[in-house]
Amino acid sequence: RGLGDVYKRQIKRSSIILGQLLEAVICTFLEVGIMSIVSLLFSVKPQINLITLLLTLILVFLTAFSMAGLAYGISLILPNEVMYETVMNAIVLPIFFLSNALFPVDGMKGFLAFIINANPFTHVISAIRSLLLYGTIDIANYLFVVSLFVLIASISFGWAFYRLNKEMNL
């Protein structure tokens, strides 16, 4: 048995997907690190301790993993990069603008309030904002957000796995 035997082994498809998703998560953490340094230069004073940092990192990991799975699954059904970029913009921009990322939604009423509250990113943004800006967290809300994103991550991973199997078994 030599090194050549190692290279001849078949890689599990779930490992391929997991590697792709974890790469996206690592890139996300690098981006978050850079943005954190930049925010400190603008005199942002986060309420960070070990617990809030750990809880925030869990939320960032789950969010990045979920979105990476969705993006990977979408990339497997589209014919080229131009279509991928167009579709991702059509998904990401409404999700971003229909969340509480840019404006407060406390007094909002009606259909728009319903849409914003149905957006999972509204909840994860609120949880991260509460952790970093105020150093507090509502445990029930935090567990809801973690459960929601574990579910979304599981579904997106499963869908990406399904799409990869379908793509490779043509």
Region roles according to the model:
Residues 3-7:
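Short, small-residue-biased leader/transition segments that mark boundaries at the very start
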Residues 13-88, 136-161:
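Alpha-helical transmembrane segments and their short interhelical loops
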Residues 39-40, 44, 76, 100, ...:
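Transmembrane helix-loop junction
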Residues 31, 35, 91-100:
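Mobile beta-alpha loop/short-helix "lid" or hinge segments that flank ligand
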Residues 1, 69-77, 107, 111-114:
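Membrane-spanning helices that line or support transport/gating and their immediate boundary helices
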Residues 96, 100-151:
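Membrane-interfacial helix-loop-helix junctions in multi-pass membrane proteins
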Residues 162-170:
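Short cytosolic juxtamembrane segments of multi-pass membrane proteins
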